[in-house]
Amino acid sequence: MAAKPAPFGQSCSNCHKTTTSLWRRGPDNSLLCNACGLYQKHRKHARPVKSEDLKDISPLIQQVCKNGTCAGDGFCNGTGGSASCTGCPALNNRIRSLNASKSQSGRKSLSPNPSSVPSSTETKASPTPLESKPQIVSDTTTETSNGTSRRRSSHNQHEDSSPPHEPSVTFCQNCATTNTPLWRRDESGNPICNACGLYYKIHGVHRPVTMKKAIIKRRKRLVFNGNANESQHNLKRMSSGDSGSSVKQQSTRDGPFSKSFPNGNGHASGNSGEGLAEHGMNTGVLPPASTFPSYNSNFTGFLPSSFNPSPLMTLSRLAAGEPDNNGKVYYSYGPTQEQSILPLPENKHEGLPPYQNEYVPNGIRANQVVYPGQLVAVGNDSSKQLSESTTSNTDNNGVATANQSNPLGMKFHLPPILPVGESVCLPPRTSAKPRIAEGIASLLNPEEPPSNSDKQPSMSNGPKSEVSPSQSQQAPLIQSSTSPVSLQFPPEVQGSNVDKRNYALNVLSQLRSQHDLMIQELHNLNQHIQQIDEWLRSSDNENMASEHIKSSTPAVVASGALQT
């Protein structure tokens, strides 16, 4: 006994079952039932089926699926013809309509009054009342509940690949098509196709009949027809629109309401695949970024070759004689382009100019020229002579001229020092103790004169001898005067003089520690500067000596030639 055909023509390609809990896809994109799909997924080959369990496909379904013209590349016409079309909603609807028409013709052939039944040729020639129903309705307009007019198209106005409408066949009440992947309903409850339903949902009006297409763009699937040339041709047809036949097929599918994308000039271009034609999907090369409208072409393509996280490391390397990276040093704490320790070029237009940055790390600007000559260590007497020679060599405009300490006559740029965190030498802040910054500001900037009881005791009396010897040997930061200095303490230490004294000693120790750190950093900088200056002097002397030897050698040879 032959198996009952599926009402929608959906059956497994392996066992031909029409019912399953879940439909799956095989490696060739064919439709499989749940059992065959899981077997194929885990064992990588088809599930064996017994001969008695094998279901036969209806001849009508075999004919439709074999003689169809659909390529299965995402542009569906509901006729079948490829493995991807199995289970397509449009194909299922077509097979159901064919089954309904076949059963209807069978019932007419079994009618007791054969004279009332027209012949097969008359049935094909003359439309039935149900078939001509959309044509009659197309000339009239009906008012909906929203007050908008609905237009219904006739079956003869736009050719449809579906057969004549039957009572069991669902067709769109707006465009009279039976080829759709999803059925929807309008505000009155009538079935409409997916395109008309989405158009009404988005725009609030019914879809014009002129937008009707015979081909539906479905989800793109891979094509496994066994013909590689045909599949490649389909991919090229979708990616490019320059060939003649491809453009014609593209325009046939898209219709008069095809989308157009703006080009670089801001005008709409009908062919959106020109960029992909040159840089297609098959080549794997993306189109250049300049073809996009919103692309900014001001990027010069300059990227730093290396990053140096520490300027002090750069100074030590230069002092050891190592060359820098093409005259440019980059720091990780700022986005600016810094210059190296080498002399600045005479032509300022060569290369990229340094960017101007408002961020001033540690009080030194990024492009500020520092120390035009040799620096002397702090505390030497020669520092005064250097300052006097520098001031004496300044002209009326205030511009310093080259002196003997700078034989090259060029200015050098030193990178700024990385800011040191304030948590290096400071004690942890607690809620009980006031902030150090507030204490320094209150001590150095008194707002109102304190009372006589708030005066700090003299530095030579009483417990002042408890100061450590290291602090007593150092020179005070502020010169002591005959009259005691008036200080204003924060409200947390407005108690006894002992609390004020302890607070003042704490602030003084913090200031001295910061002073020691600054002195040490300046000492290290002076050592590096002296080493660099000595190296530059020695290299300059070597260059001058080599030039002198080259200039004197031809004269000796010439004199020898004259003597001979």
Curated annotation (Swiss-Prot):
Its main location: nucleus. It is found in: Nucleus. Residues 135-148, 240-253, 260-271, 381-407, 450-486 have a biased composition (Polar residues). Interacts with tup11. Keywords: DNA-binding, Metal-binding, Nucleus, Phosphoprotein, Repeat, Transcription, Transcription regulation, Zinc, Zinc-finger. It comes from the Eukaryota. Residues 100-170, 226-285, 381-409, 443-496 are annotated as: Disordered. GO terms for biological process: intracellular iron ion homeostasis; negative regulation of ferrichrome biosynthetic process; negative regulation of transcription by RNA polymerase II; positive regulation of transcription by RNA polymerase II. Transcriptional repressor that binds the consensus promoter sequence 5'-[AT]GATAA-3' during iron-replete conditions to down-regulate transcription of target genes. Represses the expression of the iron transporter fio1 in response to high iron concentrations. Also represses the expression of str1, str2 and str3. Represses the expression of shu1 in presence of iron. This is Iron-sensing transcriptional repressor. A zinc finger (GATA-type) spans 12-36, 172-196. GO terms for molecular function: 2 iron, 2 sulfur cluster binding; DNA-binding transcription factor activity, RNA polymerase II-specific; DNA-binding transcription repressor activity, RNA polymerase II-specific; double-stranded DNA binding; iron ion binding; iron sensor activity; iron-sulfur cluster binding; RNA polymerase II cis-regulatory region sequence-specific DNA binding. It comes from Schizosaccharomyces pombe (strain 972 / ATCC 24843) (Fission yeast). The modification Phosphoserine is found at residue 109. Activated by iron. InterPro entries: Transcription_factor_GATA (IPR039355), Znf_GATA (IPR000679), Znf_NHR/GATA (IPR013088). Residues 109-120 have a biased composition (Low complexity). Signal peptide: none annotated. Transmembrane segments: none annotated. GO terms for cellular component: chromatin; nucleus.
